[in-house]
C-alpha cells in the first residue's frame, strides 16, 4: 500500500509517536501502532525512529499500513434493547461502547452482528454486506436510539426522510461550562480535520451542518442540553458544541484529553426519534431513558 502521510501539528509537541499514530488513524490501536514502528513501517522526516520517540511538532510522518483483512458480518447472539419492532423497522437503544457495523479493527461484536442474529435475514440489503438495514449511525461512545430497516422499501422511505430532514433525532448531553443563552443554533460546515484523520472539524467549504440546542438545566461548571439534528454529519453534535466552546463531558477527542472517572464514553444520548412509518405513513414517536452513567453524572454535578 502507498504510505499515508501525516503532519504532526504543534499541538502534538512532546507526544509519543505511538500515541500520535493511534489518535490520528481510524481503527489503529496504540499496540498496533507500536508494531508498525518496530517493523519499520513508520518514518519521521524520512528516517526510522523508536516507538518512544517524542514529536517536536511539524514533522512529516509516513505510515505504511498492511492490507486490511477481509471483514464479514456474521450473526452473533448479542442482547439488544429493542424499543420498537414490526415487519418493516426495528429501533434499538444502543449502549455506549458498541460499534454500529463491522470494519477493520472492529470485525465483530457490533450492532449489525446483533441485528443479523435477531432479525434472521430480514434486514434491508441497501446498505451493503457490512451495513445491512442501517439507515443512520451513531458514534461508538454515544448511546441511544437507532433505526434499522427490514426491507429495501422501508430503507428507501426512511432514507428519503433522513435526506429531507423530516426524520427527527433528539439528543441530550452534558457540556462543560455554562451556556449563557437558553437556546440557539449552530450553523457551521463540517469536514475531515485537515491534519488529524480521526477528527472532524468546522471547515469552510465543508458539508452543511446545523444543530439546534436548548438548555435543560444549568449546574456549577456544566450545562444539561437537548440537541436536535437538522443534518447528520459525522460527530456533528460533538464538533458543534466544542466549536462554541462547550465540549461534551467525557469527549476525549473534542474536549479534555483526560478521562472522566466513572464515565466510559461521552455524556451524549440519542433520547428521541420521530419518523413516518414506511408502510402506514403514520407518525411514530419514540423515546428512551438516559443511561445509568449519564444519570449518575447528573447527580454528581448537581452537588
What are these regions (language model features)?
Residues 1-32, 80, 195, 204-207, ...:
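Pseudouridine synthases involved in rRNA/tRNA modification
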Residues 1-185, 189-194, 267, 293-301:
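RNA pseudouridine synthases
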Residues 45-51, 221-224, 259:
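Short alpha-helix capping/helix-loop boundary micro-motifs
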Amino acid at each position: 500500500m502507498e504510505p499515508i502521510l501525516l503532519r504532526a501539528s504543534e499541538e502534538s509537541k512532546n507526544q509519543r509517536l505511538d500515541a500520535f499514530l493511534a489518535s490520528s488513524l481510524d481503527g489503529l490501536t496504540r499496540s498496533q501502532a507500536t508494531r508498525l514502528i518496530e517493523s519499520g513501517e513508520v518514518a519521521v522526516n524520512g528516517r526510522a525512529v523508536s516507538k518512544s520517540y517524542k514529536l517536536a511538532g511539524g514533522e512529516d510522518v509516513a505510515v505504511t499500513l498492511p492490507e486490511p483483512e477481509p471483514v464479514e458480518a456474521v450473526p452473533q447472539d448479542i442482547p439488544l434493547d429493542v424499543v420498537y419492532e414490526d415487519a418493516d423497522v426495528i429501533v434499538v437503544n444502543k449502549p455506549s461502547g458498541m460499534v454500529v457495523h463491522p470494519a477493520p479493527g472492529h470485525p465483530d461484536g457490533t450492532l449489525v452482528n446483533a441485528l443479523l442474529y435477531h432479525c434472521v435475514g430480514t434486514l434491508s440489503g441497501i446498505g451493503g454486506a457490512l451495513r445491512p438495514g442501517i439507515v443512520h449511525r451513531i458514534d461508538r461512545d454515544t448511546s441511544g436510539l437507532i433505526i434499522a430497516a427490514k426491507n429495501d422499501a422501508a430503507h428507501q422511505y426512511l432514507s428519503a426522510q433522513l435526506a429531507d430532514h423530516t426524520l427527527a433525532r433528539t439528543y441530550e448531553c452534558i457540556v462543560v461550562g455554562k451556556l449563557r443563552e437558553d437556546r440557539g443554533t449552530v450553523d457551521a460546515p463540517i469536514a475531515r480535520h485537515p491534519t488529524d484523520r480521526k477528527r472532524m472539524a468546522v471547515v469552510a467549504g465543508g458539508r452543511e451542518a446545523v444543530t439546534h440546542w436548548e438548555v435543560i438545566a444549568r449546574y456549577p461548571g456544566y450545562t444539561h442540553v437537548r440537541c436536535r439534528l437538522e443534518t447528520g454529519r459525522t460527530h456533528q453534535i460533538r464538533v458543534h458544541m466544542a466549536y462554541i466552546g462547550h465540549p461534551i463531558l467525557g469527549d476525549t477527542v473534542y474536549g479534555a484529553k483526560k478521562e472522566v472517572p466513572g464515565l466510559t464514553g461521552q455524556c451524549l444520548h440519542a433520547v428521541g426519534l420521530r419518523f413516518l412509518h414506511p408502510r402506514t405513513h403514520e407518525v411514530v414517536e419514540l423515546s428512551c431513558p438516559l443511561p445509568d452513567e449519564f444519570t449518575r453524572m447528573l447527580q454528581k454535578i448537581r452537588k
